[in-house]
Design a protein with these regions (language model features):
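Domain-length accessory/inserted modules outside core catalytic folds
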Residues: 198-200
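Short beta-strand edge segments in extracellular beta-sheet folds
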Residues: 163-169
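C-terminal cap/substrate-recognition subdomain and adjoining C-terminal extension
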Residues: 33-64, 113-119, 187, 193, ...
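Bacterial N-terminal signal peptides that target proteins for export
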Residues: 2-15
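Asp-based phosphoryl-transfer active-site loop
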Residues: 173-187, 304
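Bacterial N-terminal signal peptides
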Residues: 14-24
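Peripheral membrane interaction modules
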Residues: 160, 174-176, 193
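Intrinsically disordered, serine/threonine/proline
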Residues: 24-163
Length: 352
């Protein structure tokens, strides 16, 4: 040790303390002057007008013209993702009452451009089941927001519509089942009754009745700044009808996800239970947080539990409410609504 440090230890210690204190003050001052990164504002691009297809592309196959002579019965899944996770857009293209598949034909994928028009993302070709898949990687995702999609058959200009929703990671969601949860009847109760249940809905002969307070609870959750997910065991053929029903009944807008395969409709854990579980887990993998979930069936309880939704935030209507420590709703939402209104709005990583 040097003579100076030996002779003046107090002075040296005092100087060192002052230096550290000064450095801390400078760092704190710098942090105070550095603005926090602003939360992104959600864009809502849902008012664009899709121009009429002026020139149809020639059909790849002569048989396609015959198939397309029936009424278009196309469908497409809504897409929900975060800014850090690419997605695959999917659609199913068929015609007529027998739902004849459109095979090996081109479909153009368009997105609302936020300026009153649509822009093309590219094209895809249907497979032998009438389906298309179109990958949209993370770099091509639009800014956080809600965007209308149009999947247009190039041969005749018919369209399947869907919505793309993009949020920052750690966005908190609320999930709703539909049949038996928002409606008074459940298609999942008896496997043998599935066809009988869905056929009147498909034909338009029956309009499902909503549970008392169901519209209000979705409106409340939306007002609390939760994006909503409508997760149902309904088959893809009911996509358009289900969207229309949610809209005309006054339910808050949300992401609709239906089954893609007949096995997923089955009212068992291995059927609709696994379908819902896997979809919810895919949302978690994309960076979402499942804040609460509403259902009515044991398959809902299974799926929500498997996706790690807390039983205290799992609300079950009907006779299964309370099972597995879930929260019973009874036959309506009148008791639940006042309690839900007391909840503070969540901290979300976006602003509207």
């Amino acid at each position: 040790m040097s003579r100076r440090m030996t002779e003046h230890p107090l002075i040296t210690l005092t100087a060192l303390t002052a230096l550290v204190s000064c450095t801390f003050c400078y760092t704190s001052s710098l942090e105070a002057r550095t603005p926090k990164k602003a939360k992104p504002k959600l864009q809502v691009c849902t008012s664009g007008v899709l121009d009429k297809l002026e020139k149809h592309r020639d059909w790849e196959h002569r048989r396609s013209a015959l198939v397309a002579s029936g009424k278009a019965d196309h469908s497409a899944q809504d897409i929900l993702t975060t800014t850090r996770h690419g997605v695959t857009l999917t659609g199913k293209f068929a015609y007529g009452r027998s739902s004849k598949d459109l095979e090996d034909e081109f479909v153009e994928i368009l997105i609302d451009a936020c300026d009153g028009s649509y822009k093309s993302l590219g094209t895809a070709k249907t497979d032998d089941d009438g389906r298309i898949s179109f990958a949209l990687d993370m770099a091509r995702l639009p800014k956080p927001g809600v965007y209308n999609l149009a999947l247009r058959v190039q041969g005749d200009g018919t369209v399947a519509r869907a919505t793309l929703r993009v949020f920052p990671p750690k966005t908190k969601l609320v999930v709703f089942d539909i049949d038996g949860t928002l409606t008074t009847k459940d298609a999942e109760i008896f496997q043998d009754a599935i066809a009988d249940f869905f056929e009147p809905i498909y034909s338009g002969d029956v309009v499902p009745e909503s549970r008392e307070g169901a519209v209000e609870i979705t409106a409340l959750r939306a007002q609390q700044n939760y994006p909503l997910v409508y997760l149902t065991g309904r088959p893809y053929a009911l996509t358009r009808i289900t969207r229309e029903w949610l809209n005309t009944q006054g339910f808050a807008p949300g992401n609709l996800h239906v089954t893609d395969e007949s096995e997923q409709v089955l009212p068992t854990e291995k059927g609709v239970g696994v379908f819902k579980r896997d979809y919810l887990k895919s949302l978690i993998a994309r960076g979402f947080i499942l804040e609460a979930a509403y259902g009515n069936a044991e398959t809902d309880i299974f799926a929500y539990s498997a996706a790690k939704v807390s039983p205290r935030r799992t609300f079950i209507a009907g006779p299964h409410g309370g099972k597995e420590k879930t929260q019973p709703l009874g036959e309506g939402y009148d008791t639940h609504l006042p309690e839900a209104k007391k909840e503070a709005a969540p901290k979300q990583p976006f602003r509207r």
